[in-house]
Amino acid sequence: MLKILGILLCCVLSLPAQAEERPRLIPPGWTQTVADRETRTRKFVSPDGQASLTARQVSADAGAANRGLDRVAYRDGEQVTYHRRAPSWVAVSGYRDGNIFYRKINLACHGTRWNFVELEYPRDMKRAMDTTVTHIARGMTRYYDDCGR
């Protein structure tokens, strides 16, 4: 009986740790096509090859966290239809070259690093990609305290 109670106690105590695990942001079945250690950039492509996800990291100046954020959030030739910004992140979405793009940039590693994620996919994939975009956007906020690779 004590053995069973001990096992149950261990299971209960491990629940918060499991709940705080970082979410996997790369969708299942996507293939990595680029891994550049120098620029800390990785690119993934959907199984059908129509959608892509690019992720990269750059150092952040803790004293000027917001300086220059708009410069990296916006690009020429894009029609922005969605923009949200907070002190530690910015999200931009819209159309570019006939495709939909979604870009989110947020502070990570206790404010010492910017994490960038950008998805691009055809307009007709919007409904299919909505869940993926939402999962990635929400999941990125869980990396603020993470200083891993």
Across the structure, where does each feature detected by a protein language model lie?
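Hydrophobic h-region of N-terminal signal peptides that target proteins for export
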Residues: 5-18
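Secreted/extracellular small peptides and ectodomain modules produced from precursors
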Residues: 8-9, 107, 145
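Secreted/luminal cysteine- and crosslink-motif detector
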Residues: 11-12, 110, 148
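Generic secondary-structure transition motif, activating predominantly at the C-termini of alpha-helices
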Residues: 13, 70-77, 137, 141
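Surface-exposed amphipathic alpha-helical segments
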Residues: 22-32, 117-149
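Conserved polar/disulfide-associated segments of primarily extracytoplasmic proteins
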Residues: 32-116, 121-127
